[in-house]
Amino acid sequence: MALKKRSKHSKKFKLNLGPQHPATHGVLRLILEMDGEIVERADPHIGLLHRGTEKLIEYKTYLQAIPYFDRLDYVSPMCQEHAFALAIEHLLKCEVPLRAQYIRVMFSELTRILNHTLNIATQALDVGATTPLLWMFEEREKIMEFYERVSGSRLHANYFRPGGVAQDLPEGLIENIVDFCEQFPCKIADLETLLTDNRIWKQRTVDIGIVSKQQAMDWGFSGVMLRGSGIAWDLRKSQPYDQYANLDFDVAIGKNGDCYDRYLIRIEEMYQSIKIIKQCIQKMPVGEIKTQDPSISPPKRSEIKKSMEALINHFKLYSEGYNVPAGEVYAAVEAPKGEFGVYLYSDGTNRPYRCRIKAPGFAHLQGLDFMARGHSLSDIITIIATLDIVFGEIDR
């Protein structure tokens, strides 16, 4: 509950929180105007991780720009690659093979689990519970191993491509993902046993950081922050992309718009992600994993060894890239943190003229001020954790 009772002798002062504080989940500097232990105003200072990503992309070919998206929200990298790939595909008007679409959806949902396990585990750690962190990192390790087997990297995957994915699934990976899907719901249940009905956890999260429906709309919230306030908006349902329209899953929404509701939604989303992954595995056909258009997709290694034309095409695609037709497009995906969007403007050359990135955490951090007012200093840590912010995407 927000603390409103004030002492006659309370003294107002300013408190600097961060940017080196572990509970700020990155390089966040907060200037808090305090009245004793009560927060009257919270002023976030951002930009400490600014690297000029949008400008750097303008100097790269479309293929060379993909790794920059892994380094935005580095907790859920593949979802951001997905948005950039969709934007390029809209301009190219290229068809993505069915198998590639299911692989993309499957890894997007694995990424969602990767994100939510970290968020819940670190939020629990911030309020004093160590066990969830140890348990969930064990599960995250398995997903990172799937990342490594499919892309060669545990974190910055660089796996999605305009027109499909970089390479097919290695032998035995599907079976391992099936095994993971069978045992992971039990791990979520164990996590719920620790937290959901825990008296201390509820005291730290119930009625903390309340966001009303109107506030969520006014501040441009998306994802869990929006659904926690009772608004059933999920891009996978409302504006389906790839194969989401053919998959059966539910959208979890909250009632009270507090930290506890948002925790429950993240738990339910992990259950739904497992459901989606299982359907992807069942429906995934045998076939190509990227478009066969030679002007976009490099030839196979076997073709390069036989054909000089294939070798030349391969060299040109990796050295010069391909020209994307002039035009502009906005493509968005339902990333774990909210709506991640890419506005792409092409002038018909092999490099983007402008690439504007919409990061969900940017809007959510703006709302920290009204969410924090009237709460104690210790509640600020819980509110920052429930925002699920990563400064790679906020500062860009």
From Swiss-Prot:
A GO molecular function for this record? Answer: NADH:ubiquinone reductase (non-electrogenic) activity
List keywords of the entry alphabetically.
Answer: Cell inner membrane, Cell membrane, Membrane, NAD, Quinone, Translocase, Transport, Ubiquinone
Question: In terms of one coarse class, where is the protein primarily found?
Answer: membrane
* Cellular component GO terms held in the UniProt record: plasma membrane
Top-rank taxon of the source lineage equals Bacteria
Q: Where in the cell is it found?
A: Cell inner membrane
Q: How does it sit in the membrane?
A: Peripheral membrane protein
Catalytic activity, per the record?
a quinone + NADH + 5 H(+)(in) = a quinol + NAD(+) + 4 H(+)(out)
EC numbers on record: 7.1.1.-
Record-stated family: Belongs to the complex I 49 kDa subunit family.
Report the function annotation for this chain: NDH-1 shuttles electrons from NADH, via FMN and iron-sulfur (Fe-S) centers, to quinones in the respiratory chain. The immediate electron acceptor for the enzyme in this species is believed to be ubiquinone. Couples the redox reaction to proton translocation (for every two electrons transferred, four hydrogen ions are translocated across the cytoplasmic membrane), and thus conserves the redox energy in a proton gradient.
State the PANTHER family in the record: NADH DEHYDROGENASE [UBIQUINONE] IRON-SULFUR PROTEIN 2, MITOCHONDRIAL, NADH-UBIQUINONE OXIDOREDUCTASE 49 KDA SUBUNIT
UniProt subunit comment: NDH-1 is composed of 14 different subunits. Subunits NuoB, C, D, E, F, and G constitute the peripheral sector of the complex.
Its protein name is: NADH-quinone oxidoreductase subunit D
Can you name the source organism? Orientia tsutsugamushi (strain Boryong)
